[in-house]
Amino acid sequence: MKPKFLFVTLLLCLLGGCSDYPAEKGLTKARLEHKQGRALYNINGKLFVPILYSPPFSISRSPYGEDGRINYSNFRDAGIDLVEMHMELRNAWNRDGTLNIPMVRHELISVLEGILEINPDAYFQVRVDFHAPRWWLDRYPAEMVHYARGPIDFGTTNDIGRAPNASLASERWQQEADVIVKQFLDYLQTTRVGKRVFSFLIGGACGSEWTYFGYKQEPDTGDAMTRRFRQWLADKYVTDVALQQAWNDPRVTIATAVVPDMEERRYNLGVFRDPQKERRILDYYHCHQETIESVINHFTQFFKENWPSDVLVGLFNGYLFSDNDFNSTGYLYFGRLLDSPYIDFFAGPYNYNYDARDAGGTSQPRSLVGSVNLHGKLFMTEQDRITHLIAQSRNNETTFTTDEQSVAMLRTNFAQLVSLASGYWFEEFSGFPGYAPYVAHEPLQEYAGNFNSPALMSEIGRQKRYYDQAVHHDYEREADVAFFYDFDTFYYLAEVDNRQTREIEYASNNWLTADAYRSGVSFDTYLYSDLRKVDLSRYKAVVFGTTYCISDEDMVFINDQVKKDGRLVIFNYAPAYTDGTKLDVRRIGKITEMEVRPIKITTPPVMTILGNHYGLEADGSPGRVPVSPLFEIDDAGVEVLGRYQGSDAVAVARKKQPDYTVVYAALPLRGPGMMRKLFREAGAHIYNDADDVVIAGGGIVCVATREDAGGPRTIHLRNGKQVELDMKPGTTVILDEHTGEILFD
């Protein structure tokens, strides 16, 4: 053991062996229980649907003011007894390594005590962050994260910027954080409110979401990560000779290797990194991602093993949909976390694409919920869409102005929960930094609250009562289409300051599924690494999204086991372009069974499909740059479905075989109409022929119209029944999937 960590280990052992706060009997026992296809909370032997209220960052946090009292009472009256609260342990981390008990009482215990006064039946999920405090960073500067874009900015606390923070590679930080977390858990379990804790949400890094500190600043070039990177290289390559051969650098050694700088990260002429020339970059990002995974594994296990009762443990992770700097954030090892015995649930907000958050939007969760369910975990959505009760919106969200708009949005959110057998918490934004606490529209609220209106709370109560009953019936998820996305692919994409990569990623990760929601079909989303685990016999169509890294072995499996049974198989952009060792356009042709060749287009590429034009829109603006590599289909044996605008070059084509059909889109496929046509011809059920959002499964069918769309709708149920609706613009209707009865309108 390293001497400098000896005192930490001794202190931890002392705390574990003879705590000053012996555990009080009667701690809550909680676990996930899978009932009739859904994951529910079993809390002290009673089942709860996974719906919570979460106000820790708002003006409503304190139950002792009127804002808090009213909102806690609202959710109590709506039948929601589960509440999330936050504790930032760096605020209670004393310089001598002990826990500041009065600060914990002030920031957490007294708040929970006040909530219990309002709702004696409340149980608590505690979100815990344990960032290093500033005094710790000053004491141990060699343990800090550094950024390739520039020096640490000691004047900012914005964790997306170059703020001072402990490196996730720091062994000292991890060991000393263990000590403070252990003291916190030991103390919490002695309190009256600690007996009501059923779950811990383990927060980490930027925004509690396990995105690496300063991920847009290209971390981590600091000493701690450099040490870890060298150890990682030693484990992988063993000898300097092997490293030199892999990196094509006769001068490098394991002992002198450093984290790549900005020039190395930024240098690239196209969308892809060449694994034969840029192995150093690929190696660092693998080390970076493994570091985050290691820290998560450590702390989730630590919480499980140091809480003397059964307790749920989860974290934010697995973000795909929306916008992300995938290499530098921290989710590329999500597939391995899904197998962790110490993680019960994963969480994330809704997709930030405006088609998800606009009026009439999809409310798409950011993660691949199909894989979460497949692995027996629970997915919890942070229901953070802004209602009309907050004066300003954020990102791409519509600024709602009426109860009716907000109710429609809440219904779409709820439909996602029911159809995916997931859960969520209602995130409170009133008084959140940057968000005005009161409405900007007349009449003003007397008290703050993102949901504090009779209409919204009535809707929330109705939804809760419905779901309390729905979970007693078998869960049915009759999706006909499966989408697969590959996190390993992102290692081979040159993301740093590269607009063309950004546009390809955005189209594949966002618009592909956004248009699928409006095609009228029900679909599931999975990790590509789960391809062999999924029961493919359920699906009429399989869509490979961002899956550009496919091994020879996987290609055989796809050709033998996916392309069969009359199934439609759709590939996008550059499927199998790399196997992890090289880039080869011939592999695209091999998997698509079409003649594919590179094409050079000197303007931002646009596809024309069914008379509509689709470019690579990102950040709310059209495609700005040419893309390289770009491909065309040069095959006389295909059916042409789309061309590049202003050219005869084929961009989308279909090839029918006796037992399956392949579609290849050389840019990520777009167009609800084209998808509807392809899915219908493959035998998938189409609920609605209008371009409305359709969410189906779990006993419901949801239809949501845009603000500029409405009118007569014919909804086709799977049992042959038809339901005629006259829908207003910007509204959401939820039907019973079997009877067609209107449940929410």
Region spans (language model):
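C-terminal motif of bacterial Sec signal peptides marking the signal peptidase cleavage site
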Residues: 16-17
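The substrate-binding groove and active-site-proximal loops of carbohydrate-active enzymes
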Residues: 49-63, 86-105, 159-179, 276-294, ...
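Aromatic-lined substrate-binding rim segments of carbohydrate-active enzymes
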Residues: 65-154, 185-189, 299-307, 549
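A short, well-structured beta->alpha microelement
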Residues: 66, 334-335, 515-534
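Polysaccharide-binding and catalytic clefts of secreted carbohydrate-active enzymes
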Residues: 129, 137-339, 343-344, 349-352, ...
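Hydrophobic targeting/anchoring helices
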Residues: 309, 314-511, 600-628, 639-643, ...
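A conserved amphipathic helix/loop scaffold
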Residues: 406, 545-745
